[in-house]
């Protein structure tokens, strides 16, 4: 079946295109063209002058719709995924906070079942813990944090083909070996919940830690010890040009001014936007976080003792609005940081992330307030308030 989207401002890799068409055939993009003549037999969609952009790739998200991926059940996974898809997420990496091995194994089984389904939005599993620095635990369960142990992580990796990313603090004993092993297995090791200094960050980068989890959160910046000043993890990451970062762009985890600074230094190709959302995101009624220590206050998730932020209640469309409306980032770049850049970081840019011939038919229509009006995921409409 052919679908032709016309009369929109289309975001292509070369920039904005007006008076063109995005043509979908089944689950693929057949063509993006500057011709808007109606195709005989195609389902014609009038974008009404709105923005036609690639679907968002959520590379760090813990839940939504009242359910958490840490539950590990198929029902929880499906509910959370569907909740985020309504707001522009067309591909997703379900994320687990620090967990026990049985919890990881349960989530792996569920993730692999869903990935095997036709046109699945699930691209793989992301483990945020549990090889973290306990001094930077944040909202992670402290009793589950430990040093990397090859007797534990090797069997997990060997039995988890869905595992695409695993975070760790590079300064912890055994972390460099862990990062090198993950990189060799095609799993992205990412720096997270860390007190790493420059030497630690550089050693991690050389071992395969090429990405940084929720940049600025749960890591130190510039600081002083007695009368002397030292760089923190943040400055160390800025000094490594090829290291990519992700930022929670809800306008709360990172101030808009810092969001803009990160964009100016790292650039659109090395900076992704994430929600780091918990179960309460896109949820109805009085939904609660999976972790009983978490409360919702001031539009964000916090530990009940207010010692740390615990995650967001954001969806992908909010990331775009925050970047544009609060951080003064051009819309095209804000969208790219939710689509093209995550695809590049996770190694799926050959089939995701941009509106180009042959890529998966993941398309959004955004109105002038940057609200989602229509979502196609693999060619199927999953949200529509446009027609």
Q: What residues fall within each predicted segment?
A:
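Conserved, mostly hydrophobic/aromatic
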Residues: 127, 182, 212, 323, ...
């Amino acid at each position: 079946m052919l679908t032709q989207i016309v009369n929109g401002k289309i975001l292509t890799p070369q920039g904005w295109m007006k008076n063109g068409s995005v043509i979908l055939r089944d689950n693929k993009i057949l063509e993006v063209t500057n011709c808007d003549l109606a195709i005989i037999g195609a389902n014609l969609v009038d974008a009404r002058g709105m923005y036609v952009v690639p679907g968002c790739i959520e590379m760090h998200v813990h839940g939504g719709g009242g359910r958490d991926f840490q539950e590990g059940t198929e029902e929880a996974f499906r509910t959370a995924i569907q909740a985020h898809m309504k707001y522009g997420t067309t591909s997703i990496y379900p994320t687990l906070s620090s967990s026990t091995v049985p919890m990881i194994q349960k989530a792996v089984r569920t993730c692999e079942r869903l990935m095997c389904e036709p046109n699945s939005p699930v691209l793989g599993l992301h483990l945020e813990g549990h090889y973290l620095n306990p001094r930077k635990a944040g909202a992670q369960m402290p009793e589950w944090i430990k040093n990397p142990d090859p007797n534990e992580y090797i069997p997990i990796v060997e039995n988890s083909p869905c595992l695409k990313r695993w975070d760790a603090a590079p300064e912890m004993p055994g972390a460099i070996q862990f990062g090198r092993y993950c990189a060799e297995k095609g799993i992205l090791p990412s720096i997270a919940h860390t007190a790493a200094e420059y030497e630690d960050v550089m050693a991690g980068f050389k071992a395969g830690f090429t990405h940084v989890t929720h940049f600025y959160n749960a890591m130190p910046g510039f600081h002083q010890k007695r009368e002397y000043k030292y760089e923190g993890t943040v400055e160390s990451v800025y000094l490594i040009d090829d290291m990519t970062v992700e930022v929670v762009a809800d306008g709360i985890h990172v101030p808009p001014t810092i969001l803009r600074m990160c964009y100016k230094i790292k650039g659109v190709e090395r900076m992704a936007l994430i929600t780091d959302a918990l179960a309460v995101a896109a949820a109805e009624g009085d939904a609660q976080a999976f972790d009983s220590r978490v409360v919702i206050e001031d539009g964000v998730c916090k530990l009940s003792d207010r010692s740390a932020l615990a995650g967001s209640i954001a969806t992908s469309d909010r990331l775009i609005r925050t970047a544009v409306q609060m951080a003064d980032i051009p819309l095209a770049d804000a969208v790219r940081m939710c689509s093209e850049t995550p695809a590049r970081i996770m190694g799926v840019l050959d089939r995701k992330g941009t509106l180009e011939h042959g890529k998966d038919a993941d398309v959004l229509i955004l109105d002038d307030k940057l609200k989602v009006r229509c979502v196609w995921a693999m060619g199927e409409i999953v949200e529509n308030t446009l027609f």
